[in-house]
Amino acid sequence: MQLNSTEISELIKQRIAQFNVVSEAHNEGTIVSVSDGIIRVHGLADVMQGEMIALPGNRYAIALNLERDSVGAVVMGPYADLAEGMKVKCTGRILEVPVGRGLLGRVVNTLGEPVDGKGPVENDGFSAVEAIAPGVIERQSVDEPVQTGYKSVDAMIPIGRGQRELIIGDRQTGKTALAIDAIINQRDSGIKCVYVAIGQKASTVANVVRKLEEHGALANTIVVVATASESAALQYLAPYSGCAMGEYFRDRGEDALIIYDDLSKQAVAYRQISLLLRRPPGREAYPGDVFYLHSRLLERAARVNADYVEAFTKGEVKGKTGSLTALPIIETQAGDVSAFVPTNVISITDGQIFLESSLFNAGIRPAVNPGISVSRVGGAAQTKIMKKLSGGIRTALAQYRELAAFSQFASDLDDATRKQLSHGQKVTELLKQKQYAPMSVAQQSLVLFAAERGYLGDIELAKVGSFEAALLAFADREHAELLQQINQTGAYNDEIEAKLKGILDTFKATQSW
């Protein structure tokens, strides 16, 4: 057999031309220790703070401690099969979660994966869990209300779109109930809701989801869950994931409401991670940056102006402002609002609704303490009619509390003082409300008008509740158009005042309560 050198050289050239070498450089490291969900890695020289590190088995860890000779990272999910010597890689990405309308009506975990058994989640893309809050120039002042459906809150502690209002109180004082009712009340308001459950029992979350479904509010709500059985890393990141999902609506000129239930458990999870990473502990063993943990989250709740929305949507949405309203929940121990985390969150938020165990146990529910509850946005976020009618309620309750304390020591009281005490008791009774029964603006206005104009004077204290129920039923039956008008416009003028007076005069004449 004769070898032709030309043929051989051609064949070699052909093979060389077809030879395809793809060189891929990636930063690789080695696990040197695994304990309590924390891994220490050698060799990741170029890793960034907060970067996702790819682990064997399609899992990830997040780099939190960048030290001279190693990287401390927290594992997202189970870590039992990770061992010393395993190879890990940098990804060059930070954690992102799916966002979009497809998430409405779904229950997802911190990573945006469905946990409700309804199949895969449709999304409009992904968004980073950590985002920079809108700047000063991009914001607009808060002047539109978010109606919670609670008389005591909407009258005395009004919440505006884009506000951060803290709900604070001991365990079992109705904090979650208040937040869930606020979500239920947004059924027809166009406000999209996000409920973030942090460190709660799975049975409690299932109950909340069932209640939202029963009241027709789940369809416009995203539920983000990091239960008590999940890792500290997932509990720490859950609020940021929920916030990214809420920002999707804010940045497109829509209104959204987000509930963080509760941030005390998130702070505990973050404390656990920090101590395991051997960061120096501070007050109550929390790390030094626990204030920043909450401030960077809550600053993302804002009302953004039309220019911001137009720039974000590249001109698709014009002339619309967007908002993300936050209702963070904090659990106190024995009413101590001066503890570390409660004082931090109080100083970050635009007001707080303080729920008291003593009021709750006395049957005053919602157990709002009007003395130390405040909204720093105030009347700017109220409808005209609520602003006009609610002014005297807070004053009446403040005077009542003062006189009630004084009357314990005084044996004989004059008529004026007795009248004020009686009025205060009736207003307190009137502000009671059952769970899952939010009220419209018109219904609240009618009830407040009755209290403000002295229509409760001759009603027995025990009959105030039945008087209110009968009055609302009468108004719904006989004056539905007026109630509809008030709900749509929120206006208050002499004509509406005369009509409200007419309703109450006619109703009181019937004596049907």
Curated annotation (Swiss-Prot):
On whether Nucleotide-binding is a keyword of this UniProt record, the answer is yes
The record places the site described as Required for activity at: 373
> Which CDD domains has this protein been placed in?
ATP-synt_F1_alpha_C (cd18113), ATP-synt_F1_alpha_N (cd18116), F1-ATPase_alpha_CD (cd01132)
The record's annotation in Pfam families points to:
ATP-synt_ab, ATP-synt_ab_C, ATP-synt_ab_N
Q: Which GO terms describe its cellular component?
A: plasma membrane; proton-transporting ATP synthase complex
Which reactions is this enzyme annotated as catalysing?
ATP + H2O + 4 H(+)(in) = ADP + phosphate + 5 H(+)(out)
Q: State whether keyword Translocase applies.
A: yes
* Compartments, as annotated in UniProt: Cell inner membrane
Q: Which residues bind ATP?
A: 169-176
Q: Name one GO molecular function term.
A: ATP binding
- The domain of life is Bacteria
Q: How does it sit in the membrane?
A: Peripheral membrane protein
Provide the E.C. number(s) assigned to this enzyme: 7.1.2.2
Q: Which UniProt keywords apply?
A: ATP synthesis, ATP-binding, Cell inner membrane, Cell membrane, CF(1), Hydrogen ion transport, Ion transport, Membrane, Nucleotide-binding, Translocase, Transport
Looking up InterPro entries in the UniProt record yields: ATP_synth_asu-like_sf (IPR023366), ATP_synth_asu_C (IPR000793), ATP_synth_asu_C_sf (IPR038376), ATP_synth_F1_a_nt-bd_dom (IPR033732), ATP_synth_F1_asu (IPR005294), ATPase_a/bsu_AS (IPR020003), ATPase_F1/V1/A1_a/bsu_N (IPR004100), ATPase_F1/V1/A1_a/bsu_N_sf (IPR036121)
Q: Which NCBIfam families match?
A: atpA (TIGR00962), PRK13343.1 (NF009884)
Q: Which HAMAP family match?
A: ATP_synth_alpha_bact (MF_01346)
What protein family does this chain belong to? Belongs to the ATPase alpha/beta chains family.
Q: What does this protein do?
A: Produces ATP from ADP in the presence of a proton gradient across the membrane. The alpha chain is a regulatory subunit.
Please give the subunit comment from the record: F-type ATPases have 2 components, CF(1) - the catalytic core - and CF(0) - the membrane proton channel. CF(1) has five subunits: alpha(3), beta(3), gamma(1), delta(1), epsilon(1). CF(0) has three main subunits: a(1), b(2) and c(9-12). The alpha and beta chains form an alternating ring which encloses part of the gamma chain. CF(1) is attached to CF(0) by a central stalk formed by the gamma and epsilon chains, while a peripheral stalk is formed by the delta and b chains.
PANTHER family under this entry?
A: ATP SYNTHASE SUBUNIT ALPHA, MITOCHONDRIAL
What's this protein's name?
ATP synthase subunit alpha
